[in-house]
A protein has these predicted regions:
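N-terminal Rossmann-like dinucleotide-binding module
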Residues: 1-39
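Donor/substrate-binding cores of folate-linked one-carbon enzymes
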Residues: 80, 84-197
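Short alpha-helical
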Residues: 10-11, 68, 89, 141
């Protein structure tokens, strides 16, 4: 499958690496480079580092308002766009381009903890379980139909980092399963529409 990958932080790394092993990643979109605290050195996102190491074409747009960029994405003829912690909301013009749509890995069991910081929210709220959700992307944030979910227990000793690391690996594996279902036209939507908690 021809895939455009969109992601930025460490959480997205296993997903890009695993997808790149099994599919054709035609380009990677990540947030713009930022200067470090002293402003002397430019820091690349973890996703950009991996994309560079794998000779993948990289885009770092500030937004998706440039018609030339939208046309360039159309010309790539992606089968699918995969989003993992990208940090930008995609407009309908982008969502409508890929043959099989756009899917997103979210680090909670939707509809619980839509939006930002779901890992923190699960720990702060004392949840006994968390997990990952793969869903279709719509214009509304974290509102698309859920394709797959996988749960994991939250222990009393759980930290943000331990749960983050477990979910990023669970999510990468679940993404591959979702892509396979999409490829075989075997997707059975689990939840038709997400609602706010």
């Amino acid at each position: 499958m021809r895939i455009i990958f969109m992601g930025t932080p460490m959480f997205a790394l296993p997903s890009l690496e695993k997808i790149n092993e099994k599919h054709e990643v035609i380009s990677v979109f990540t947030k713009a480079d930022k200067p470090n605290a002293r402003g002397k050195k430019i820091n690349y996102s973890p996703i950009k580092e991996v994309a560079l190491a794998n000779n993948l074409k990289i885009y770092q747009p500030e937004n998706f308002k440039d018609e030339a960029l939208i046309e360039e994405i159309r010309n790539m003829q992606p089968d699918l766009i995969v989003v993992v912690a990208y940090g930008k909301i995609l407009p309908k013009e982008i969502i409508d381009i890929p043959k099989y749509g756009v899917i997103n890995l979210h680090s909670s069991l939707l509809p619980r903890f839509r939006g930002a910081a779901p890992i923190n929210a699960a720990i702060i709220n004392g949840d006994k379980k968390s997990g990952v959700s793969i869903m279709y992307v719509e214009e509304e944030l974290d509102a698309g139909a859920v394709i797959l979910q996988e749960e994991t227990e939250i222990t009393d000793e759980e930290t943000f980092l331990s749960l983050h690391d477990r979910l990023k690996d669970l999510g990468a594996d679940l993404l591959l399963k979702a892509i396979e279902l999409i490829e075989k036209d075997e997707v059975e939507v689990k939840v038709k529409k997400q609602h706010k908690n």
